[in-house]
């Protein structure tokens, strides 16, 4: 199994980007993406891709990590803390507070080189990836900023994670018949 992290800036990235010059937008995104990426990599994560203001990352591939869920959870919380520390720098560019949503899920994902014989990406696919993305988006409904699946909570706790997890609800997500916790 792998841990998948999906993060996204919130509070109107489109609106923020419309109000910035190309140079300011580049400075803002590079500052944010660099800081978050450094944390993910320090916790043994693999950056899958950047999609605009979003970061997709995973743990437990290409090398095995017996504590991958713990690493992912701790990286997510450190990213939130770092974003708070960076607020004054970011507000100087955006003129508004910047927040992010993070979704974490542990599950089976297919990881490898996907594409054509002319171009391919080392990436991951599968239900675990989709659920992490859905959890990231569901934060908006609950007024939260970091959400993980029950499977991630269990695996992180088993690996010695000392954080407090709060059960919010059984959630029905797009593409699944059964609710997730």
Labelled PLM ranges:
Residues 43-44, 48-51, 82-103, 142, ...:
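Catalytic core regions of nucleotide second-messenger enzymes
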């Amino acid at each position: 199994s792998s841990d998948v992290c999906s993060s996204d800036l919130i509070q109107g990235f489109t609106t923020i980007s419309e109000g910035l010059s190309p140079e300011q937008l580049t400075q803002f995104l590079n500052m944010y993406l660099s800081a978050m990426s450094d944390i993910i990599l320090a916790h043994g994560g693999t950056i899958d891709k950047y999609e605009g203001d979003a970061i997709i990352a995973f743990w437990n591939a290409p090398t095995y990590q017996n504590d991958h869920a713990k690493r992912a959870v701790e990286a997510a919380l450190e990213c939130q803390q770092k974003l708070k520390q960076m607020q004054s720098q970011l507000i100087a560019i955006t003129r508004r507070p910047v927040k992010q949503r993070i979704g974490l899920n542990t599950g089976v994902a297919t990881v490898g080189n996907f594409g054509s014989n002319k171009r391919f990406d080392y990436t991951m696919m599968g239900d675990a990836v989709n659920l992490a993305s859905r959890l990231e988006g569901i934060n908006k409904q609950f007024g939260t900023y970091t959400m993980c699946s029950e499977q991630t909570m269990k695996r992180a706790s088993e690996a010695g994670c000392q954080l407090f997890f709060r059960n919010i609800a059984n959630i029905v997500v797009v593409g699944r018949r059964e609710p997730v916790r």
